Amino acid sequence: PQEVALADARKGINMYMNDKVNVPILGLVENMSWFTPAELPENKYYLFGKEGTKRLAEELHVPLLGQIPIVQSICENGDKGTPVALDENSVIGQAFLELARNVVAQTEKRNAELAPTQVVKTHK
């Protein structure tokens, strides 16, 4: 992602990790990681930079949960009402499947290693 997007993510994560807020971060997801044309599914074009989210995850000691590419079929299938993410044989389907697996794994790890998140009431 672009540097301004990384700066915004860094600010948000730092806010949530602050002792006064203390909201656990499961990890980062990079949307629009690269462009893959349908006719060349093995090709990746990094339109917004490469590995910025990976570097941010390493810097902040949080896992990179997934990278979601830009593919034209997302829009086309969305317009038809058939989410391409459900097609496990597609590039985007594989990306969402990996993301889902990583979210489950990090949630299980968080639940095993950290105390339950406390609910804070802000009003009566």
Region locations from a protein language model:
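Histidine-centered active-site loop/cap adjacent to the catalytic His
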Residues: 89-112
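A short, charged, Gly/Pro-tolerant segment at domain boundaries
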Residues: 102, 112-124
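Conserved catalytic-core segment of NTP-binding enzymes
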Residues: 1-76
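C-terminal boundary of histidine-terminating zinc-finger modules
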Residues: 78-92
